[in-house]
UniProtKB/Swiss-Prot annotation:
Pathway: Purine metabolism; AMP biosynthesis via de novo pathway; AMP from IMP: step 1/2. GO terms for molecular function: adenylosuccinate synthase activity; GTP binding; magnesium ion binding. GTP binds at residues 13-19, 41-43, 306, 332-334, 415-417. Belongs to the adenylosuccinate synthetase family. Gene3D superfamilies: Adenylosuccinate Synthetase, subunit A, domain 1, Adenylosuccinate Synthetase, subunit A, domain 2, Adenylosuccinate Synthetase, subunit A, domain 3. This is Adenylosuccinate synthetase. GO terms for biological process: 'de novo' AMP biosynthetic process; IMP metabolic process. PANTHER family: ADENYLOSUCCINATE SYNTHETASE. Homodimer. The active site is at 14 (proton acceptor), 42 (proton donor). NCBIfam families: PRK01117.1, purA. Its main location: cytoplasm. It comes from Shewanella frigidimarina (strain NCIMB 400).
Length: 431
């Protein structure tokens, strides 16, 4: 029987999931997105050519791989079409490889307008959303007024539903946020214009995955964002609007949780965060600047500068706990090359001297803690492009071993550069 593997981020996103998914899809027959939307940014570098995907699964560049967008993903038709056209322009036969659940909620222009208006109204309390309508679209889903891809296939009914929901949202835009209303007719026309095209790619995702599983075909589930941004388990309210954890696979694709064989947690050798929110190990100094510049830490979706910091083992233990991580992939180890010392956060200390090895459950709790660091020797030698453990300097190996001890979880894959071949697979998740 084939294995079913989940690849997800264990930090605040931007861990390097896209490259690892692309690498592992060589062994998969299906690659499935199960949450998030085009707020994700997965960067692939193949033979020096860079491709950034926001909505379509990273396996789309592989022959003989079916890419699936599950029901847990919110889909902006314009963003989807832009990505499809970009890939087709590069000669990728998207229609032959991509399948979509018709239960996916739609992101429409009024969702984006609401997202932007809310962030502006929050002022200094802004969450740091991408402004792409993700949160408002999930709100509509939960409130049971949302429109789904399947609604597009009945034009008359879609028009009626759209009119009702737009009355509600345009009232909020004009009367509360004091901004312009979104045009109903334009929204309707634009959505219906691609209905037939989308219909040709729609399928019953849960049924398809069940058939594939029973046939022994390996399936890879591609997470977006990261564990610490999970709507329930992240640094609330500075979180995304979906379940970014392994539990999201079942709800976002209809694949039974008992059939998952391996959870691969992607973890950078340091930590970054983009946008607002607590970050105990943040480095607002020269070392942080060094890491940020060397790691080219700019958001793939927004281009915003990411906030760098030391690796937080306390937060990573929480990620292991929530996701039942089988093994880690450590990425961007080479970014730490040249540092005299590297630090790992091993605990949090409160003002009264109390030490905790557990993360707070809400964002406010992080204001009360100071990170406790364990300092290790750095290394001057390069790790860039290393493909065997023996090629790594002893100090880098010790750093890896210490992380395994602290997290009580093996590091099964190590990434030492952006390209596919700059990777060492110590344990193959599919074997």
């Amino acid at each position: 029987m084939g294995k079913n593997v989940v690849v997800l981020g264990t930090q605040w996103g931007d861990e390097g999931k896209g490259k690892i998914v692309d690498l592992l899809t060589e062994q998969a027959k299906y690659v499935v997105r199960y949450q998030g939307g085009h707020n994700a940014g997965h960067t692939l570098v193949i033979d020096g050519e860079k491709t950034v995907l926001h909505l379509i699964p990273s396996g789309i560049l592989r022959d003989n791989v079916k890419c699936i967008i599950g029901n847990g993903v919110v889909v902006a038709p314009d963003a989807l079409m832009k990505e499809i056209n970009m890939l087709k322009g590069r000669g990728v036969p998207v229609e032959e490889r991509l399948l979509i659940s018709e239960a996916c909620p739609l992101i429409l222009p009024f969702h984006c307008a609401l997202d932007i208006a809310r962030e502006k109204a929050r002022g200094n309390q802004a969450i740091g959303t991408t402004g792409r309508g993700i949160g408002p679209a999930y709100e509509d889903k939960v409130s049971r007024r949302g429109l789904r891809i399947g609604d597009l296939f009945n034009a008359e009914l879609f028009a009626t539903k759209l009119q009702e929901v737009m009355k509600y949202h345009n009232f909020m835009l004009t009367e509360y946020y004091k901004v312009e209303a979104v045009d109903y007719q334009q929204t309707l026309d634009d959505a219906l214009a691609i209905a037939d095209y989308l219909k040709s790619m729609c399928t019953d995702v849960s049924e398809m995955l069940d058939v594939a599983r029973k046939a022994g075909e390996p399936i890879l589930f591609e997470g977006a964002q990261g564990t610490l941004l999970d709507i329930d388990h992240g640094t609330y309210p500075f979180v995304t609007s979906s379940n970014t954890t392994a539990g999201g696979v079942a709800t976002g694709s209809g694949f039974g949780p008992r059939h998952l064989d391996y959870v691969l947690g992607i973890m950078k050798a340091y930590t970054t965060r983009v946008g607002a929110g607590p970050f105990p190990t943040e480095l607002a100094n020269e070392i942080g600047d060094y890491i940020g510049e060397k790691g080219q830490e700019f958001g793939a979706t927004t281009g915003r500068k990411r906030r760098p910091g030391w690796l937080d083992a306390v937060a990573m233990r929480r990620a292991v706990q929530i996701n039942s991580v089988s093994g880690f992939c450590l990425t961007k180890l080479d970014v730490l090359d040249g540092l005299k010392e590297v630090k790992i956060c091993v605990g949090y200390q409160y003002a009264d001297g109390t030490v905790s090895k557990v993360t707070p459950l809400a964002a406010e709790g992080y204001d009360l803690v100071t990170p406790i660091y364990e300092t290790m020797p750095g290394w001057s030698e390069t790790t860039f492009g290393a493909t065997t453990i023996e090629q790594l300097p002893p100090a880098a190996i010790n750093y890896i071993k210490r992380l395994e001890e602290l997290l009580e979880t093996p590091i099964d894959i190590i990434s030492t550069g952006p390209d596919r071949n700059e990777t060492m697979i110590l344990v193959n998740p599919f074997k």
